């Protein structure tokens, strides 16, 4: 059994994205029906993760609400964050996780989330190098953005209920924008 050096863990919750270039950082999240897209530029050594609740679309009126819940918004934020840190779009690669159907009697929003992520990445010309989506159980995900390594654990029983609860928590309220403009 190989022991891993302890790295700095950064948790990505629903409605967030993180971009890092530190090889000692591992990004982690817990997914039920939500999806996390993990992207990186293997040459520049920068990578990141997002965590979205609903697919959304640029033409959907629902997306005009709390944008941080929607994949269309968080995918753009993640890509732009990577580019700002020196990644090149033509070198980006992605892995997709989550999208479980955790509650049988509800519509399969997890499947819709995963399908959205696949189509978005295809439309953007970003290569998908790994995917683990669907199923009936949540996942705990760890992603090392600099190397692209990912590890997941299936959540069953109590862990699955915790993942469902995590997915149903509201996203954090957006921070107010600071401005030096005074309106009167």
From Swiss-Prot:
GO molecular function: protein-glutamine glutaminase activity
A biological process term (GO) from this entry: chemotaxis
InterPro entries in UniProt: CheD-like_sf, Chemorcpt_Glu_NH3ase_CheD, Cytotoxic_necrot_fac-like_cat
Annotated keywords: Chemotaxis, Hydrolase
Stretch list, region Disordered: 165-184
Keyword Disulfide bond part of the UniProt annotation: no
Any matching Pfam family: CheD
Function per UniProt: Probably deamidates glutamine residues to glutamate on methyl-accepting chemotaxis receptors (MCPs), playing an important role in chemotaxis.
Family affiliation: Belongs to the CheD family.
Xref: PANTHER family: CHEMORECEPTOR GLUTAMINE DEAMIDASE CHED-RELATED
Catalytic activity: L-glutaminyl-[protein] + H2O = L-glutamyl-[protein] + NH4(+)
Full protein name: Probable chemoreceptor glutamine deamidase CheD
Keyword Oxidoreductase (UniProt): no
Listed EC numbers: 3.5.1.44
Enzyme type, top EC level: hydrolase
